[in-house]
């Protein structure tokens, strides 16, 4: 909103929901990686083919196929409970439910949708993951999530949340949506004779102190 966009959606998922389902299915790491890539790309036939080749129970296979279709309103959260009894996955669902409550209290729920099949190729995500979308771009304009153990690699044990804004895509969206962004900038150019160099430097420092 601060950038000027009026119509946008932030899509929420949880990294541990997929991990819980994979854990419940007893998948090896290689299969989990392959399946993650297929789900990320919403490749229904690829998921079907991969799981069929692993001789998994039909119920398990159908559960992962349903995962590809579980995106949209907050009602997807309740449906997700029917897919699993895994504690890790259910804890992820409970977290999403709590976040939905908070978003409603803050009056932000209309900007939010859910994708239970949202996965990330980045293994350091440990909780909520999200992507933001708007009209006029072919991809997300912001992406991020929670990573509780990433900072351990840099010597600090601390939970964290981070995100990245795709500035070029935001600007493209603003242009295509014909949104004018207020822009105020005062520029100053100081011309001086060599004899006035010191005074010009002082004046330049003064202007920079005023963020000009």
Residue ranges and their predicted role:
Residues 12-24, 118-126:
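Beta-rich nucleic-acid/ligand-interaction surfaces
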Residues 12, 29, 41, 58, ...:
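Short, amphipathic alpha-helical segments
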Residues 19, 41, 170:
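Short Asp/Glu-rich motifs
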Residues 1, 7-11, 19-23, 28-33:
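Class II aminoacyl-tRNA synthetase-like tRNA-binding/catalytic domains
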Residues 1-6, 49-212:
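Positively charged, Gly/Ser-enriched RNA/tRNA-binding surfaces
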Residues 7-17, 35-38, 113-117:
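Short, surface-exposed recognition loops or helix-turn segments adjacent to catalytic cores
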Residues 26-49, 56, 108, 134:
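Acidic, His- and aromatic-enriched active-site or binding-groove loops in soluble protein domains
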């Amino acid at each position: 909103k601060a950038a000027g966009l009026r119509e946008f959606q932030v899509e929420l998922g949880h990294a541990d929901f997929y991990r819980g389902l994979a854990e419940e299915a007893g998948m090896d790491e290689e299969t989990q990686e392959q399946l993650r890539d297929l789900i990320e790309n919403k490749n229904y036939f690829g998921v079907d083919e991969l799981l069929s080749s692993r001789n998994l129970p039909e119920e398990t296979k159908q559960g992962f196929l349903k995962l590809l279709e579980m995106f949209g309103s907050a009602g997807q959260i309740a449906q997700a409970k029917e897919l699993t009894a895994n504690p890790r996955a259910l804890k992820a669902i409970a977290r999403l439910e709590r976040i939905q409550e908070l978003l409603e209290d803050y009056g932000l729920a209309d900007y939010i949708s859910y994708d239970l099949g949202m996965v990330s190729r980045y293994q350091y995500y440990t909780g909520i993951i999200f992507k933001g979308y708007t009209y006029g771009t072919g991809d997300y304009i912001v992406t991020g999530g929670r990573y509780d153990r990433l900072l351990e690699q840099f010597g600090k044990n601390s939970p964290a949340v981070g995100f990245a804004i795709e500035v070029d895509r935001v600007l493209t969206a603003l242009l295509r949506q014909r949104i004018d962004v207020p822009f105020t900038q005062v520029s100053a150019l100081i011309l001086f004779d060599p004899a006035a160099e010191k005074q010009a430097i002082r004046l330049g420092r003064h202007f920079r102190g005023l963020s000009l």
